[in-house]
From Swiss-Prot:
GO biological process, one term: histidyl-tRNA aminoacylation
Alphabetical keyword list: Aminoacyl-tRNA synthetase, ATP-binding, Cytoplasm, Ligase, Nucleotide-binding, Protein biosynthesis
Subunit structure: Homodimer.
Protein name: Histidine--tRNA ligase
HAMAP family attached to this UniProt entry: His_tRNA_synth
Main location: cytoplasm
EC number(s) from the headed UniProt entry: 6.1.1.21
Pfam families on file: HGTP_anticodon (PF03129), tRNA-synt_His (PF13393)
Origin superkingdom: Bacteria
Gene field: hisS
């Protein structure tokens, strides 16, 4: 038997319904904040992610589905969504239009990592990217948007924020951090030694416990912030507080990607076992220029849909749609034609077999239908149909010409 690949799962109807509910909520909130949908390819040039995500990241170093296609091109399945959206922004010359552009996306991402609860090799993200707006108010709006999504989904989270500063802040901080790492070179892991050379700040993202113990004494990035970066970070906290959003400052929060500056944030949930990030993002003012575009501000976030699904469990069991059936074989053609007309306006399940009433009712219940419609010999003679609301249990016989009015 051929099965799905390890770390890649089917979404059967109940899970697919939950996925759709989550995405619908995300889209509704994003649109309220002025975001429009963008669709980008699943397959991109590998160079895109090497330049955007960074050579020192685990994604590029260990996790990409990378291969050479039949044309000899070095390509990979997208491991995250931001880089593709930025590429599309540049390719469409929107970086030269001097306008603010807000986009949202959702879909499959791919990383070759060890599958575990809430973490798959093919997984789904919902994300938003804003280009051309450098105000810290936009950073706050992004965070408020994510907070609103989780509120609507009734998911409890902890928000952690940090500032990575601007270019001058980062230069000053890296000098202090490298000095600290050199002093502890014999104690840190090999990955951290590699990161020290490529992008020192990423050592703070190391998951090895012995390294984390060492980094408790590392210099704090917020002590190296320029006046401008410090003012922006203070303003961000002020806006969040004014809007009733609680947060914790985590000076070790650097995200896993190399292109962030100033604001970085994560929403953490402990509802799927150990504390786990369910959404994260921040500002990346250098990324558009890194990828060959005209320098442009950027800020955004992404959230893991599977992790949200783990928290919410199965989709709600709200009844929906119409179940239409006949008690006699002679009337199956009639209900089929009736159902075909109703499908222009309603969700209709048609039973092609004549069965006893109780059997039909059982089938309708199993399919979670809201409205049960049945035609028997007597109803046909009188040009009527038997109607039952399976939610309220109300039932009656109604004239066929009044059916659509009853269905609403």
């Amino acid at each position: 038997m051929i099965t799905a690949l390890r770390g890649m799962k089917d979404m059967l109807p109940a899970r697919a319904k939950l996925y759709a509910q989550i995405i619908k909520t995300c889209e509704e909130v994003a649109k309220n904040y002025g975001y429009e949908q963008i669709l980008t390819p699943h397959l991109e040039e590998t160079a895109l992610f090497k330049r955007s995500v960074g050579e020192s990241s685990d994604i590029v170093g260990k996790e990409m589905y990378q291969f050479e296609d039949k044309g000899g091109n070095d390509v990979c399945l997208r491991p995250e969504g931001t880089a593709g959206v930025v590429r599309a922004f540049i390719e469409a010359k929107l970086d030269r239009a001097n306008v603010t552009k807000r986009c949202f996306y959702h879909g499959s991402m791919f990383r070759y990592e060890r599958p575990q609860k809430g973490r798959l090799r093919e997984f789904h993200q919902f994300g938003c990217e804003c280009f051309g707006e450098g105000s810290v108010y936009e950073d706050a709006s992004i965070i408020l948007m994510v907070s609103e999504i989780f509120n609507r989904l009734n998911i409890k989270t902890t928000l952690k924020i940090n500032s990575l500063g601007d270019e001058s802040s980062m230069k000053s901080y890296k000098e202090k951090l490298v000095k600290f790492l050199d002093e502890n070179d014999d104690k840190i892991c090999e990955d951290c030694k590699r990161r020290k050379l490529l992008n020192p700040i990423r050592v703070l993202d190391c998951k090895i416990e012995s390294c984390q113990e060492i980094y408790k004494n590392a210099p704090v990035i917020t002590d190296s912030l320029s006046d401008e970066a410090q003012a922006d970070f203070a303003k961000l906290q002020e806006i969040l507080t004014a809007n009733g959003v609680k947060f914790e400052i985590d000076t070790k929060l650097v995200r896993g990607l190399d292109y962030y500056c100033k604001t970085a944030f994560e929403f953490i949930s402990n509802e799927i076992g150990s504390q786990s990030a369910v959404a994260g993002g921040g500002r990346y003012d250098r990324l558009v220029e890194y990828l060959g575009g005209r320098a442009s501000y950027g800020v955004g976030f992404a959230m893991g849909v599977e992790r949200i699904m783990e928290i919410l469990g199965e989709a709600g069991d709200e009844r929906d749609g119409v179940y239409l059936c006949a008690l006699d074989a002679a009337n199956v053609d009639f209900i089929y034609n009736l159902g075909s007309k109703l499908r222009k306006k309603y969700q209709v399940e048609i039973s092609y077999e004549a069965k006893k009433l109780q059997k039909h009712l059982q089938n309708a219940d199993n399919k979670n239908a809201k409205i049960f419609l049945c035609v028997g010999e007597n109803e046909m003679k009188e040009n009527k149909i038997w109607y039952k609301n399976l939610e309220t249990k109300d039932e009656k016989t109604i004239n066929l010409d009044e059916l659509e009015k009853e269905l609403g």
